[in-house]
Amino acid sequence: MGDWSALGKLLDKVQAYSTAGGKVWLSVLFIFRILLLGTAVESAWGDEQSAFRCNTQQPGCENVCYDKSFPISHVRFWVLQIIFVSVPTLLYLAHVFYVMRKEEKLNKKEEELKVAQTDGVNVEMHLKQIEIKKFKYGIEEHGKVKMRGGLLRTYIISILFKSIFEVAFLLIQWYIYGFSLSAVYTCKRDPCPHQVDCFLSRPTEKTIFIIFMLVVSLVSLALNIIELFYVFFKGVKDRVKGKSDPYHTTSGALSPTKDCGSQKYAYFNGCSSPTAPLSPMSPPGYKLVTGDRNNSSCRNYNKQASEQNWANYSAEQNRMGQAGSTISNSHAQPFDFPDDNQNSKKLAAGHELQPLAIVDQRPSSRASSRASSRPRPDDLEI
């Protein structure tokens, strides 16, 4: 048997990039397959053809009968099985090395951009693209490769192919040999002159090893299935929690109830901005709501609020008896909210409006009227 150290070193590197189930599968592969195959099994099948005897003196009869009974040796069959079930894992390891190589290139490019940034060059967009690529390849900040995206798909595909190869080799072994060996094999094949009986050496020992390798194959298949379900449900769980792609941006417009950072919004929808300036024409205590004119519901509400504000303003102007008011009647006309630049231009061209004091509209009592000697604007002159 050849040296397994090269394959063992390659598979050992996969340990750092596998799940718990993958690590157990690799342990089973190393201990119960490669190690056992290189020591006990090979010695048990070392004399399989030389100890295969038939009750005939015809030259070549034993060779053709052995070829009919064992088209391929059990040892070589298990070697092929180990190689085939290890190839998907090696392909996954190649993908990991590819991602690590991409990481080195991205880190080198990022360092060059940071050097250019210190010289005053605007490279924020390029740095952001590098971060997105790192997340796409599954590279974390500390340089560790995380299983997600294309790397996760490669891992799932490798598990599927390992399971397929395990099932295929079990079926082939059952079709060619069965899962037990007989002590006597009957052969009738040219150049044998007649039907001959051939005898196998150590059939019981070989049957025990066959059953043991069968159990190991079933255990490996079960580990692959468990790991497949584990990786699948873990991916679904991460996607539900929103951890799959933090750089993903929604294309739809934000709702006014969530976008509270804008300067124009409706505070009645659950947003409030303590930094938003009040309108210069509104008296203290009033809240003149503003909103996005493209939103029909906010626009209707703002028109009603503006009508009420203008009605309050005109009523106070009439009560104070100020002539030359900018409001000619007590019914304010609804208007749409212009931009801030238009408001400033209109205020500069017209009269500057003074803030109004809040007047108590409740009728005063007689006692308070007699007690107060101050003249009121609505008193009649005699």
Curated annotation (Swiss-Prot):
For the keyword Translocase, the answer is: no
Q: List the disulfide bonds.
A: C54-C192, C187-C198
Q: Which GO terms describe its molecular function?
A: gap junction hemi-channel activity; tubulin binding
Q: Which GO terms describe its biological process?
A: bone development; bone remodeling; cell communication by electrical coupling; cell-cell signaling; heart development; microtubule-based transport; negative regulation of cell growth; regulation of apoptotic process
Please report a single Pfam family linked to this protein.
Connexin
Extracellular side of the membrane: what ranges?
Answer: 45-76, 177-207
Q: Does the UniProt entry include the keyword Ribosomal protein?
A: no
Q: Residues where Phosphotyrosine occurs?
A: Y247
What is this protein's name? Answer: Gap junction alpha-1 protein
Organism annotation: Chlorocebus aethiops (Green monkey)
Query: Coding gene?
Result: GJA1
